[in-house]
Amino acid sequence: MRAAGLGLGIGLLLLAALAGPGGSAEQGGVPAKKLRMAYATGPLLKFQICVSUGYRRVFEEYMRVISQRYPDIRIEGENYLPQPIYRHIASFLSVFKLVLIGLIIVGKDPFAFFGMQAPSIWQWGQENKVYACMMVFFLSNMIENQCMSTGAFEITLNDVPVWSKLESGHLPSMQQLVQILDNEMKLNVHMESMPHHRS
């Protein structure tokens, strides 16, 4: 009975590890794919967002409203990646947790390899394998998510920054964003209509 429970717990952990936040292409160490690109001929509005912070839905809502109001604007969105050191830590943890879970399951003592005595927490893990595996998995996932979360919601129009959550500390309201875009579009039209003087 205990072996069946252990097998079920291990199966659930492996399934969650494959589908967990550290393993997804959107948040892992691999560069994130584009969230969406609307094919149009006008200016490019680019969003760089923290997907692991839950901003994808906000981006999709903004994109829907903006594409209705400004049909000529091209809209791109991508994951704003954290600094390389945090990406490497998250990648290391995603592999390390699987190795550690494997060692707990097979009962192999890694401390004996280094000629050290196993600490009491390792002994506890061997006596409570399911709980130990779950604890390692969820604790590691929590740290991975923290490493990958940037809190970013950066917006540029033709590579000119128009909003930065990292600087302002909050997301723009839809009204703010529309007002910013209106001002930028009017400025662009005004600049294009000015006569070019030759030197």
UniProtKB/Swiss-Prot annotation:
Keywords assigned by UniProt, alphabetized: Endoplasmic reticulum, Membrane, NADP, Oxidoreductase, Redox-active center, Selenocysteine, Signal, Transmembrane, Transmembrane helix
Q: What is its EC number?
A: 1.8.1.9
Catalytic reaction annotation: [thioredoxin]-dithiol + NADP(+) = [thioredoxin]-disulfide + NADPH + H(+)
Give the location in the cell. Endoplasmic reticulum membrane
Give a Gene Ontology cellular component term annotated to this protein.
Answer: endoplasmic reticulum
Record field: transmembrane: 95-115
List, in alphabetical order, the Gene Ontology terms for molecular function in this entry.
thioredoxin-disulfide reductase (NADPH) activity
Q: Where is this cross-link: Cysteinyl-selenocysteine (Cys-Sec)?
A: C50-U53
Keyword Transmembrane belongs to the record: yes
Signal sequence coordinates:
1-24
Taxonomically, the superkingdom here is Eukaryota
User: What is one GO biological process annotated to this record?
Assistant: response to glucose
Q: How is it modified after translation?
A: May contain a selenide-sulfide bond between Cys-50 and Sec-53. This bond is speculated to serve as redox-active pair.
Q: Give the protein's biological function.
A: Selenoprotein with thioredoxin reductase-like oxidoreductase activity.
Q: What name does UniProt use for this protein?
A: Thioredoxin reductase-like selenoprotein T
Gene from which the chain derives: SELENOT
